[in-house]
Each structure stands twice: as structure tokens, then as C-alpha cells.
Amino acid sequence: MRKTLLHYVLFSFLFALVLAGFVYASSPVDKKEYVTITVAPGDTLWGLAKQYEQEHHMPPDEFIRWVVDVNHLPSPRLAAGEQIVIPVLKSKQGGSVAVNQ
């Protein structure tokens, strides 16, 4: 009986933890808090991930996935002149990030 109760409590805790993770992961991003840039000819998401790596501290593949998801891009390809939000907080940009707004 006691073992069953322990399993029930443990299962409930794990379920709540997983559910909280899904809710947090699906929370919308407030784009106003992040830097918006204008894509220059020849820019790639991989190149932007490397260019801004000191400001976002994400692996390049995570940076690319974030940009594609938040900007609702149909593919990871960028077009010159396109404006995209990148995972660099405006409050953290200091003087080191060149921002095109």
C-alpha cells in the first residue's frame, strides 16, 4: 500500500514537471524584447549565429531553430532586405551589436 502511494506521488510529480515544461516551451516570445535586424545580401542563419554568438550564447543549431520558429520562416533561407528577430535581448546589446531597426 505504501509503495503504491509513493509511486502515485512520484508519477504525479513527474507529470506536473513535464506539463510545466510544455507550457513554458510553448509560451510566445515577446519580439519587442529582442533585436531586429535587416538581412544583408549573403547573410545566412549560420553566419548570423556565429556573428552574434557572444550575445546569445546558444549553439548555432538552436539559434537557427529559434529564428525560424519565432519569425515563422518557411525555411532557414534568408532573403536580402528581410527583417528578422534574433535571440539577442535589446537590454544586453550594449555597444557591441550592430542593430538595423
UniProtKB/Swiss-Prot annotation:
A GO-annotated cellular component: cytoplasm
Domain annotation LysM: ranges: 35-86
Keywords per UniProt: Cell cycle, Cell division, Cytoplasm, DNA damage, DNA repair, Septation, SOS response
Cell compartment(s), UniProt: Cytoplasm
Ranges in coiled-coil conformation: none
InterPro entries: Cell_div_suppressor_YneA, LysM_dom, LysM_dom_sf
CDD domains with a match to the protein in the record: LysM
A biological process from GO: SOS response
Signal peptide: none
Function: Inhibits cell division during the SOS response. Affects a later stage of the cell division protein assembly, after the assembly of the Z ring, by probably suppressing recruitment of FtsL and/or DivIC to the division machinery.
Family, similarity comment: Belongs to the YneA family.
Protein name: Cell division suppressor protein YneA
Gene: yneA
